[in-house]
Amino acid sequence: METIDHKICRLVRYYVRMVGSRDPVAIAKFAGIGIATMPLSNVAGYYTLVQRKRWICINEDIPSDSPLFKVVVAHELGHALLHRKENCAFIRKHTLLLTSGIEREANQFAAELLIPDDMLQEYSGCTSDQFCACTGYPKELIDIRTKYM
């Protein structure tokens, strides 16, 4: 039986190959998942299924060109592809700590999607703090990615 780690890697490889990009917004569009921005108070984003249509909702306070936007979309995309029938919120102050199985899997999906092997190679001589300063990604994301290599 396939482990969840292998399933996540396989899903990421499939969508990157089909879309030709690691952009979570482009992958969501390809997969028929809508993305909407709206006021969400202290929630950075959430995934929901409404009348068989999958939606990723992102806090309108997060600039669409920011690394945080990519991280939140990638995390929620992980939920959409791995946990289709679950409604999942990503708290703005969330530190990517492994709070539950489905959150760990969504975090792992985001890390695998946004930090490919060639990026790890490019930054191999850097500390995780330097990596984060260069990419804008949270430290927890690189920690998750290197844990599941």
List PLM regions with ranges.
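Active-site hotspot residues in diverse enzymes, especially metal/ion-binding acidic/histidine motifs
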Residues: M1-M149
